[in-house]
A protein has these predicted regions:
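Canonical tetratricopeptide repeat
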Residues: 5, 37-40, 44, 51, ...
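Register position in tetratricopeptide repeats
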Residues: 12, 51, 84-85, 118-119, ...
Length: 288
C-alpha cells in the first residue's frame, strides 16, 4: 500500500517514470495473487505508463487486465490509447467490446463520445449519445448522466429537466452539471449559484474545481477562477496538480498581477523543468 500511495503521489507531481516503478514494486509484493487491489494498481500503472510516453507499455498493461477479467473499463481505456496512436479501427473495436460487456453504463457512452469528438469523429460520437438516451433512467445518477448527454447535444431545456430530477433526489454532483448548462446558456448568475452549491457540499474534486475555474476564465472572472484553482490545490488528492498550477498562473497573468504570475511560474519551473511551453511563458513574464 505504501508503494501504491507513493506512485499516486508521483503522478500528482509529474514524476511518471517513478510512478511506474512504484506501482510495479507494489505488484511484485502481491506474490501471484490477483484481487481488487492488484487490478486497481494495474490501472494506475497503465495511466502512469501512458503519461510517461510509454504508450505500448500502457496497452500491454490494459491487455493484461483484459486477459484476466475482460473488464469494460480496460477495453475503453485501451481503445482511447489506440485513438491516440491513430489506430481508430482497433479503438472502435475496443469501444464496441466495452459496451458489449457493460451496455447500460451512461458514463461509458459519454467517454466514447468525448474521445470520438476529440479525434474529429463528432457525428459518429453523437450516435453513441443517441444510443445512451434510449436507455431507461432508473436512478438519480442516471438522470444526471442523461442531463450531461443533453448538454453535449445542445438540448439545454431537456438537460435542465433531467438534472433537476437528480437534484430533487439529493444527488449533489448534479449541481455541478447544472452550473455547466447555465454557463453554456450564458446565464453566469445561475451558473455560479449551482457551482457554489456544489462547492459548499465539500464533494468537489480537483478536476471539478479546475473546470469551474476554467469556466470563470472564459467569462473574464479571473479572481474567481484563481479562488477555484487555489481550492483545488488545497485538496488532499490533486492528480492534475500540474495543469491546475499552470492555469492559475495564466489567471494571474490575465488579471494583470504579473508579479504573482512570475513568482508562481518560478516555483512551477522548479517542479516541472521539462515543460518547454512554460519556459517560454516565463521568458515573457520576465519582460513585464
Amino acid at each position: 500500500d505504501a508503494y501504491r500511495q507513493y506512485g499516486i503521489n508521483c503522478i500528482e507531481n509529474g514524476s511518471y517514470d517513478d510512478a511506474v516503478d512504484a506501482f510495479q514494486k507494489a505488484l511484485d509484493q502481491s506474490v501471484g495473487s490477483v484481487g481488487a487491489e492488484e487490478l486497481d494498481i494495474c490501472y494506475y500503472k497503465a495511466k502512469a505508463q501512458y503519461l510517461s510516453g510509454d504508450v505500448d507499455g500502457a496497452i500491454d498493461t490494459y491487455t493484461a487486465i483484459i486477459d484476466y477479467n475482460k473488464d469494460s473499463d480496460a477495453y475503453y481505456l485501451r481503445g482511447c490509447i489506440y485513438f491516440a496512436k491513430n489506430d481508430s479501427d482497433k479503438g472502435l473495436k475496443d469501444f464496441k467490446t466495452a459496451l458489449s460487456e457493460n451496455d447500460d453504463n451512461y458514463e461509458l457512452y459519454l467517454g466514447i463520445y468525448e474521445t470520438l469528438s476529440k479525434y474529429g469523429m463528432n457525428d459518429q460520437g453523437k450516435e453513441y449519445l443517441d444510443k445512451a438516451l434510449k436507455l431507461k433512467a432508473k436512478t438519480a445518477d442516471d438522470y444526471m448522466q442523461r442531463g450531461r448527454i443533453y448538454t453535449m447535444l445542445g438540448d439545454y431545456d431537456s438537460a435542465i429537466k433531467s438534472l433537476q430530477k437528480a437534484i430533487d433526489e439529493k444527488l449533489v454532483k448534479a449541481n455541478y452539471y447544472m452550473g455547466e448548462v447555465y454557463q453554456k446558456k450564458g446565464d453566469n448568475d445561475s451558473s455560479q449559484k449551482y457551482f457554489k452549491k456544489y462547492l459548499d457540499s465539500g464533494e468537489a474534486d480537483s478536476y471539478d474545481l479546475m473546470n469551474m475555474g476554467q469556466a470563470q476564465m472564459d467569462n473574464g472572472n479571473y479572481d474567481t477562477a484563481i479562488t477555484y484553482f487555489q481550492n483545488a490545490l488545497e485538496l488532499e488528492s490533486v492528480p492534475n496538480k500540474q495543469q491546475i498550477t499552470k492555469a492559475m498562473i495564466i489567471a494571474y497573468e490575465y488579471s494583470g498581477d504579473f508579479a504573482t504570475a512570475k513568482s508562481k511560474m518560478e516555483e512551477y519551473m522548479k517542479d516541472y523543468p521539462d515543460d518547454e511551453d512554460a519556459a517560454r511563458e516565463y521568458q515573457f513574464l520576465e519582460t513585464r
